[in-house]
């Protein structure tokens, strides 16, 4: 009886997407995403930023995310992320806006990344994936010379498929 019960439980888990799939950065960024956030720069008015992204996972497991970022009063920016899991829970990659690597961890549905922008601003970012894997809370802290110069609070949503 035990093998039958085990088989039945396994079949139920595989048949139920909510139970079988846990959120992951690879699944979240595969396809189209949209994001919005409030950027607060020291001694400036808050601005609303928006982005649109198209992501895919390459054969080697690298997640490639092409983004278009729009900010009031600034030209539209295109950028590309390339992220790859290097060990369980460890992420490394590149961002076209950054100098040097993007380093991160993924645990408890939170992707935590650190990188340095080309102008020397250090960025720390947390993306907290929802349990259903369809949206993420986005928090970013920007530092220059060790001082926080800006923050961003927002969200990213996957396009329904």
What are these regions (language model features)?
Residues 1, 19-20, 160-161:
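Basic/polar N-terminal segments that are highly enriched at the extreme N-terminus
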Residues 1-7:
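Bacterial N-terminal signal peptides that target proteins for export
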Residues 6, 20-21:
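Short, functionally important structural connectors and interaction interfaces within domains
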Residues 133-144:
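Low-complexity, intrinsically disordered Gly/Pro/Thr-rich segments
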Residues 15-17:
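N-terminal signal peptide c-region/cleavage motif recognized by signal peptidases
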Residues 23, 30, 36-118, 122-128, ...:
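Central antiparallel beta-sheet cores of small beta-barrel/beta-sandwich binding domains
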Residues 8-12:
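Hydrophobic helical h-region of N-terminal Sec-dependent signal peptides
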